[in-house]
Swiss-Prot record:
One CC-aspect GO term: nucleus
One biological process term in Gene Ontology: cell division
Organism the protein comes from: Schizosaccharomyces pombe (strain 972 / ATCC 24843)
Alphabetized PROSITE patterns for the sequence: CS
Gene Ontology molecular function, alphabetical: unfolded protein binding
InterPro entries: CS_dom (IPR007052), HSP20-like_chaperone (IPR008978), NudC_fam (IPR037898)
Domain of life: Eukaryota
Name of the coding gene: nudc
Functional summary from the UniProt entry: Required for nuclear movement. May interact between microtubules and nuclei and/or may be involved in the generation of force used to move nuclei during interphase.
Name under which the protein is recorded: Nuclear movement protein nudc
Length: 166
């Protein structure tokens, strides 16, 4: 989790290649009806209305989100957890809100993913690349086998320059 402490807000956030999760600690006993969470594809505004009205987090998002897949919930009446589904599931965010402290996305180590985690189009592309790579290895091995067989059948020929290519 990346911790962000600002004058007006304090939150923690983490991400995968597909989503961003934000955790904001709220006063114990906070219920969902005392919060106002406004999300759009590009902006986020979180306000608590009890005991007095206060904006907890507000501003333009680092990147666009899929609003229909993004959610929020209050956990144990003390944590607001916001789940943002990234529109582009192939890029890392350096921050949640533009202008807030950023992280070095070059140092992120992604978790291993499975083909089943990918969307249909990406999965098809990866499977095609894997098949082509496998076919290339098979073709190379066949060529090496044919050459080695030929060399065995013709020991009278000089293959000294060919050995480096096997």
């Amino acid at each position: 989790m990346h911790q962000v402490k600002l004058e007006e807000a304090e939150y923690e956030w983490d991400q995968t290649i597909a989503d961003v999760d934000i955790v904001i600690h709220v006063p114990k006993g906070t219920r969902a009806k005392s919060l106002q969470v406004d999300m759009s594809n590009h902006d986020l505004k979180i306000q608590i209305n009890v005991p007095e009205r206060k904006v907890l987090l507000s501003g333009p998002l680092e990147k666009q989100i899929n609003l229909d897949e993004s959610t929020w919930t209050v956990e144990e009446q003390e944590r607001l957890v916001i789940h943002l589904e990234k529109s582009n599931k192939m890029e890392w965010w350096s921050c949640v809100i533009k202008g807030h402290p950023s992280i070095d996305i070059g140092s992120i180590e992604p978790e291993n993913s499975k083909l089943s985690d990918l969307d249909e189009e990406t999965r098809a592309t990866v499977e095609k690349m894997m098949l082509e790579q496998s076919q290339k290895r098979t073709d190379e091995q066949k060529r090496k086998d044919v050459l080695q067989n030929f060399m065995k059948q013709h020991p009278e020929l000089d293959f000294s320059n060919v050995r480096d290519q096997i």
